[in-house]
Amino acid sequence: MAFNDLLQQVGGVGRFQQIQVTLVVLPLLLMASHNTLQNFTAAIPTHHCRPPADANLSKNGGLEVWLPRDRQGQPESCLRFTSPQWGLPFLNGTEANGTGATEPCTDGWIYDNSTFPSTIVTEWDLVCSHRALRQLAQSLYMVGVLLGAMVFGYLADRLGRRKVLILNYLQTAVSGTCAAFAPNFPIYCAFRLLSGMALAGISLNCMTLNVEWMPIHTRACVGTLIGYVYSLGQFLLAGVAYAVPHWRHLQLLVSAPFFAFFIYSWFFIESARWHSSSGRLDLTLRALQRVARINGKREEGAKLSMEVLRASLQKELTMGKGQASAMELLRCPTLRHLFLCLSMLWFATSFAYYGLVMDLQGFGVSIYLIQVIFGAVDLPAKLVGFLVINSLGRRPAQMAALLLAGICILLNGVIPQDQSIVRTSLAVLGKGCLAASFNCIFLYTGELYPTMIRQTGMGMGSTMARVGSIVSPLVSMTAELYPSMPLFIYGAVPVAASAVTVLLPETLGQPLPDTVQDLESRWAPTQKEAGIYPRKGKQTRQQQEHQKYMVPLQASAQEKNGL
């Protein structure tokens, strides 16, 4: 009997799974809000220099006489005249600049508060020479996500999924709330970094805890559900940001609910699969019997005993004798190959995704409308992705999503700027494909890595995604060399990464691997084709040690039938 059979015995997809999955994925509604929150809290309204304090604005011309014009006839945002230019025809916008001397905005700025009454940009004057600080805040948030993926992925394999989730909810609640009351920009950035760390842990452990409690045939459904909840969060952000335009109120509104998530997360049940892989058979039995009671299978739960579990989960128990580490991803040839291929997929998906979604003001239309459209396209995209994942498999779904996204972005690079409808449509389509790619890569990664290193592998994958999200804004600077250069780069990377999927095995209908031995035995044909399967007599010392204490996988009848 394998672990999947034990899950079926205690109720399969019963009341417990329905309740826990719902409660675990609910915080993802607000995780989407945090990831793109600065599109609204750091929006840049129209602005221009404030005249000197002693300026007489009651005379004919008023404010206009202090503002030079750019080539489009609009007031300069970062310059003002050193003295009023009374004789120049600024009011009709025909004079481009004038001959007066100019200076920076030494007395501050006047902002158009009609759309964005209050943002971190207007509060701390993050414009002109300080404009880069706005991007710094988002980059530091992504650095936090990067650190969180590494730290909490590792801790989840050591301490368990439940404990780390509880900590992450509390950290998000506290740091997000403190960011809303930050007295200055450096403190705001520090708390945003801490929020990013915690949200990375929530993202990783949400997927893993749910997948490890679900039977094989429902894992794709869970992955797709998580993706849809994240997409709904994008709708939620557009509505909430429109209703609450003040950045401090908005920051608080998307952070305070995590206090409630922290409270109810104490009732989560830790993954029995993680308990067994850690060698804690007593806790495995207790968790399974508790789930059986919740699912109305008390009698089936009573049939379980320590002896039954020892016979059924001998492999997980022997696994507990060897502690996997992040270095295992590089020592073992099979895991190293997985790590390198999956890292490329994670990086490419995140790199192109954030290249599109973090420049909403660049579309020239309502930022709230674009946010809704970007959220709406996820729904059909992820539905199609789900159908492909469940019918054709994870590998073709991942390849198609990245390839189509890259093609859409590349086409945008050659379409003229005045074709705004076509360009926007392609960007939306590309964003939908990248959202489907994220959905697939989360599920695919969790199914490829063995149990004892699964969360570490997920954490390293998410780490590479955060590297992509940090590098992505830097690529936008290449537009100074050639306007379409960023789009060519954003498109070429996912197209190239899509080819990597042919080097990975298919996981559709397969039980989760618990050891490296499981992975190698199922992946032998793919490894041989790729030329990475270790030849006889060439095993490393680490692999030989694994063979001493790992028993072969004995698939149950249900698993052999893909159930």
Swiss-Prot record:
Annotated positions for site Important for interaction with cidofovir and PAH: 438
Domain of life from the UniProt record: Eukaryota
InterPro entries according to UniProt: MFS_dom, MFS_sugar_transport-like, MFS_trans_sf, Orgcat_transp/SVOP
GO cellular component, as recorded: basal plasma membrane; basolateral plasma membrane; caveola; extracellular exosome; plasma membrane; protein-containing complex
Gene Ontology terms, MF aspect: alpha-ketoglutarate transmembrane transporter activity; antiporter activity; chloride ion binding; identical protein binding; organic anion transmembrane transporter activity; prostaglandin transmembrane transporter activity; sodium-independent organic anion transmembrane transporter activity; solute:inorganic anion antiporter activity
Topology Extracellular: residue spans: 31-135, 188-190, 246-248, 359-368, 417-425, 476-484
Keyword Ligase in record: no
Subcellular location(s) of the protein: Basolateral cell membrane; Basal cell membrane
Topology of this chain in the membrane: Multi-pass membrane protein
Site (Important for interaction with cidofovir): 230
Effect of residue 431 to A: Decrease in the level of membrane protein expression and 70 % loss of PAH uptake
CDD domains: MFS_SLC22A6_OAT1_like
Pfam annotation, one family: Sugar_tr
Segments on the Cytoplasmic side according to the record's topology features: 1-9, 157-164, 214-224, 270-337, 390-395, 447-455, 506-563
Chain positions covered by the region annotation Disordered: 525-563
Chain segments annotated as transmembrane: 10-30, 136-156, 165-187, 191-213, 225-245, 249-269, 338-358, 369-389, 396-416, 426-446, 456-475, 485-505
Processing after translation: Glycosylated. Glycosylation at Asn-113 may occur at a secondary level. Glycosylation is necessary for proper targeting of the transporter to the plasma membrane.
Effect of residue 293 to W: Increase in substrate affinity
GO biological process, one term: renal tubular secretion
Keyword Cell membrane: yes
Reaction catalysis annotation: (6R)-L-erythro-5,6,7,8-tetrahydrobiopterin(out) + a dicarboxylate(in) = (6R)-L-erythro-5,6,7,8-tetrahydrobiopterin(in) + a dicarboxylate(out); L-erythro-7,8-dihydrobiopterin(out) + a dicarboxylate(in) = L-erythro-7,8-dihydrobiopterin(in) + a dicarboxylate(out); L-sepiapterin(out) + a dicarboxylate(in) = L-sepiapterin(in) + a dicarboxylate(out); prostaglandin F2alpha(out) + a dicarboxylate(in) = prostaglandin F2alpha(in) + a dicarboxylate(out)
Glycan-bearing residues: 39, 56, 92, 97, 113
Similarity comment: family membership: Belongs to the major facilitator (TC 2.A.1) superfamily. Organic cation transporter (TC 2.A.1.19) family.
Domain remark text: Multiple cysteine residues are necessary for proper targeting to the plasma membrane.
NCBIfam families from the UniProt entry: 2A0119
Protein known as: Solute carrier family 22 member 6
Taxonomic lineage of the native organism: Eukaryota, Metazoa, Chordata, Craniata, Vertebrata
Gene designation: SLC22A6
